[in-house]
């Protein structure tokens, strides 16, 4: 799938081009596209002509006026489905689903907050992501903006492996960068919601009750008395069920077993 096919499948403006792509598993393809009409304008704070703009803010800004002129001059008769009439040339993360016959079907697109500007001096890789490309940094910024909650991506996987969410994304020994990057962007720390029992405990197959992970005993390491906490709870539940059942229930079970044995014996004689 080429860059032009990716843009056409997502119904974007022809000015969009493929910047980076990454394959996730066997059934997902994630691509990063940006518009070639986006220009970066540098505002000199020492000059007298400041175009009536606030010079105390960032010196770099996105010049959408020149982009709009180019759009109206060259693509005046084309249909616009990406919302470019509102001078919005934001970048998108496109997600594709694998289909039969080695094809990819467009699934959805995620709009980024700021347009992506290609930095030629750093030699960004346009053919694919090698772990240091633009798509990697963009996805990392998106993960930084998310608070650490049980509902964030890979949260359950991190708890199963016994590590924290920030360690999964930033590596061991770099957990402090999570809070520092959030503070630089002015993001507030969202309080954690009440965790469900499925995140911190497991459910017994026989008893159906929730049990804390640290209280579960390893089935291979058997204690002296009994075979672990799980089997002990199973015996307790079985005794409780016997107390709740009427007395004639046991006799009914014996009759059922006898009928089953007679049926099996008759089947054997018929086969013989």
Swiss-Prot record:
Compositionally biased spans, kind Low complexity: 72-84
Region (Disordered): 65-84, 171-196
Organism encoding this protein: Mycoplasma pneumoniae (strain ATCC 29342 / M129 / Subtype 1) (Mycoplasmoides pneumoniae)
Protein name according to UniProt: Putative MgpC-like protein MPN_366
Domain of life, per lineage: Bacteria
Polar residues biased stretches: 173-187
Family named by the database record: Belongs to the MgpC family.
């Amino acid at each position: 799938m080429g860059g032009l096919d990716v843009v056409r499948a997502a119904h974007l403006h022809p000015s969009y081009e493929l910047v980076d792509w990454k394959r996730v598993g066997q059934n997902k393809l994630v691509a990063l596209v940006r518009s070639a009409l986006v220009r970066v304008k540098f505002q000199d704070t020492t000059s007298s002509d400041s175009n009536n703009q606030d010079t105390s803010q960032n010196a770099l800004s996105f010049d959408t006026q020149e982009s709009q002129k180019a759009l109206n001059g060259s693509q005046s008769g084309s249909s616009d489905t990406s919302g470019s009439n509102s001078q919005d040339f934001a970048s998108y993360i496109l997600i594709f689903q694998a289909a039969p016959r080695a094809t990819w079907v467009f699934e959805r697109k995620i709009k980024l907050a700021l347009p992506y500007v290609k930095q030629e001096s750093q030699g960004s890789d346009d053919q694919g992501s090698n772990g240091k490309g633009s798509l990697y940094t963009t996805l990392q910024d998106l993960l930084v903006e998310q608070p650490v909650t049980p509902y964030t991506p890979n949260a359950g996987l991190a708890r199963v492996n016994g590590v924290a969410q920030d360690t999964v994304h930033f590596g061991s020994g770099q957990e402090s960068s999570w809070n520092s990057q959030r503070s630089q962007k002015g993001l507030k720390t969202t309080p954690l919601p009440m965790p469900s029992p499925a995140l911190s405990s497991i459910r017994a197959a026989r008893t159906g009750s929730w049990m804390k992970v640290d209280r579960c005993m390893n089935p291979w390491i058997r204690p002296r008395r009994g075979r672990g906490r799980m089997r002990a709870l199973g015996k307790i539940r079985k005794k409780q069920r016997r107390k709740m059942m009427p007395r004639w229930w046991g006799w009914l079970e014996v009759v059922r077993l006898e009928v089953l044995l007679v049926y099996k014996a008759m089947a054997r004689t018929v086969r013989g």
